[in-house]
């Protein structure tokens, strides 16, 4: 047991020389581990005579405590040095120039909406709005689509609680506006609409704008004039050819699809329209014997695709900044 002091001094020297926490733990294992040098001394106490065992045990325990104290002090020093180095590495240099902010811009669909709404404002239309979660009455019944009507199969609808729906078109805005206003009525109704559909040219959520003009003496000729003027101004082509093909919509009579002749000489469908059905006027408490009106609807996403040359509708909704910043 005469070498206790020598082992302690060697241990304290090794602790002082440890360069990091890993090396420090290796030193601890060397002296206090299962087969450590001080541990081995404790194992040998049983070989001593009883009168020597007590004094030898006290000496070894004092050496062990001294080693642990040196170890703990060194560990605290290394932890403090590690923290200081970490803080220095993460420190903010306030003298460095700041990062420039990147200017944002409107989404291409929003740009298209604003452009179209602006064109119709110059023709005397005002912009109306309404809820996206709509009752069955305003989404269907007020538009001459009663329960079990076959026209309901034309649209795949998202139903929510209390028999409400995510509106399948912005026509409910027109129904609500007619219910709360008397003619003359001249509005456009843009907004998000929802249908169960998704591919390169369809999305379960997309944007529509519908227009409505109700007044005494409004005719299909007025409808053709307004729509044709709008399309020529939007596409910036005074010679743009527009045609109206007979079609069917339950809320209009007569009804038509709207086509334009593109630069490749092909007819392209861009919307639907028609004279407001007398039943729709009656449901809104507007006298169909006194007033007539027309309505039309266009897809804002489709018009944005045409204006900006985008072939896949889904690009508008993927939030790819490399794509969107082209329109800033």
Swiss-Prot record:
<dbReference type="Pfam" id="PF02912">
    <property type="entry name" value="Phe_tRNA-synt_N"/>
</dbReference>
<keyword id="KW-0963">Cytoplasm</keyword>
<keyword id="KW-0648">Protein biosynthesis</keyword>
<dbReference type="GO" id="GO:0000049">
    <property type="term" value="F:tRNA binding"/>
</dbReference>
<keyword id="KW-0479">Metal-binding</keyword>
<feature type="binding site">
    <location>
        <position position="253"/>
    </location>
    <ligand>
        <name>Mg(2+)</name>
    </ligand>
</feature>
<dbReference type="Pfam" id="PF01409">
    <property type="entry name" value="tRNA-synt_2d"/>
</dbReference>
<dbReference type="InterPro" id="IPR022911">
    <property type="entry name" value="Phe_tRNA_ligase_alpha1_bac"/>
</dbReference>
<comment type="similarity">
    <text>Belongs to the class-II aminoacyl-tRNA synthetase family. Phe-tRNA synthetase alpha subunit type 1 subfamily.</text>
</comment>
<dbReference type="GO" id="GO:0005737">
    <property type="term" value="C:cytoplasm"/>
</dbReference>
<dbReference type="GO" id="GO:0004826">
    <property type="term" value="F:phenylalanine-tRNA ligase activity"/>
</dbReference>
<dbReference type="InterPro" id="IPR010978">
    <property type="entry name" value="tRNA-bd_arm"/>
</dbReference>
<dbReference type="InterPro" id="IPR006195">
    <property type="entry name" value="aa-tRNA-synth_II"/>
</dbReference>
<keyword id="KW-0436">Ligase</keyword>
<keyword id="KW-0067">ATP-binding</keyword>
<comment type="subunit">
    <text>Tetramer of two alpha and two beta subunits.</text>
</comment>
<dbReference type="InterPro" id="IPR004188">
    <property type="entry name" value="Phe-tRNA_ligase_II_N"/>
</dbReference>
<dbReference type="InterPro" id="IPR045864">
    <property type="entry name" value="aa-tRNA-synth_II/BPL/LPL"/>
</dbReference>
<keyword id="KW-0547">Nucleotide-binding</keyword>
<keyword id="KW-0030">Aminoacyl-tRNA synthetase</keyword>
<dbReference type="InterPro" id="IPR004529">
    <property type="entry name" value="Phe-tRNA-synth_IIc_asu"/>
</dbReference>
<protein>
    <recommendedName>
        <fullName>Phenylalanine--tRNA ligase alpha subunit</fullName>
        <ecNumber>6.1.1.20</ecNumber>
    </recommendedName>
</protein>
<dbReference type="InterPro" id="IPR002319">
    <property type="entry name" value="Phenylalanyl-tRNA_Synthase"/>
</dbReference>
<keyword id="KW-0460">Magnesium</keyword>
<dbReference type="GO" id="GO:0005524">
    <property type="term" value="F:ATP binding"/>
</dbReference>
<dbReference type="GO" id="GO:0006432">
    <property type="term" value="P:phenylalanyl-tRNA aminoacylation"/>
</dbReference>
<dbReference type="GO" id="GO:0000287">
    <property type="term" value="F:magnesium ion binding"/>
</dbReference>
